[in-house]
């Protein structure tokens, strides 16, 4: 974890500065709030990364539409891996689909996601404005466990929306992940700073 933090430190510093700027904006409009600042910054980040997100979703949908034909090829050439690979490549070329295209947007987004994670996890809040709604401190976990529940629920909804419609073993694995990931995110949110969990929930809402 410390290694990741050091590698992405320049972007972490940038994100921390953006949180400060967003907070200063809330001061200018007469409602100083780190909670509002985090929400505003999250929306801005999602807007900036929107083209990549759209590209990723389109790629996933294209792969989903190819699932029936891919299944046919897998059944037909299950004993001939070389032929299967050649036919799959021909199918991708025919339909203009790159199976790796959906990964690139995610890889581009990862540094920013990691950076905002570290920026909010250790952000030096002004203690005069660290309270938000029912939360006594954005730098501490939610004592009422509302945010962990919201993080799990929003992650589950996002997982359902982005499911690829896979079949067979892949479908079973996808079903397991759809259950596991929300529970995992909800669990780790129990110990994460509330400000960070707010970012995650809002990010899922605007996915």
Residue ranges of model-derived segments:
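Helix-loop-helix
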Residues: 1-207
């Amino acid at each position: 974890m410390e290694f990741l933090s050091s590698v992405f430190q320049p972007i972490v510093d940038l994100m921390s500065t953006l949180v400060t700027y967003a907070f200063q904006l809330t001061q200018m409009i007469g409602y100083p709030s780190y909670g509002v600042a985090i929400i505003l910054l999250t929306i801005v980040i999602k807007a900036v990364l929107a083209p990549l997100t759209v590209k990723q979703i389109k790629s996933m949908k294209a792969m989903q539409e190819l699932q029936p034909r891919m299944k046919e090829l897998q059944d037909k050439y299950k004993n001939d891996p070389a032929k299967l690979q050649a036919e799959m490549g021909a199918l991708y070329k025919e339909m203009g689909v790159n199976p790796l295209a959906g990964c690139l947007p995610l890889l581009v987004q990862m540094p920013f996601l990691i950076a905002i994670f570290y920026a909010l996890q250790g952000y030096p809040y002004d203690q005069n404005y660290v309270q938000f709604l029912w939360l006594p401190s954005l730098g501490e976990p939610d004592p009422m466990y509302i945010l962990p529940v919201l993080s799990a629920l929003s992650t589950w909804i996002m997982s359902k929306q982005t499911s690829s419609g896979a079949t067979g073993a892949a479908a079973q694995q996808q079903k397991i992940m759809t259950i596991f990931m929300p529970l995992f995110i909800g669990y780790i949110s129990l110990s994460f700073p509330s400000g960070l969990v707010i970012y995650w929930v809002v990010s899922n809402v605007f996915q």
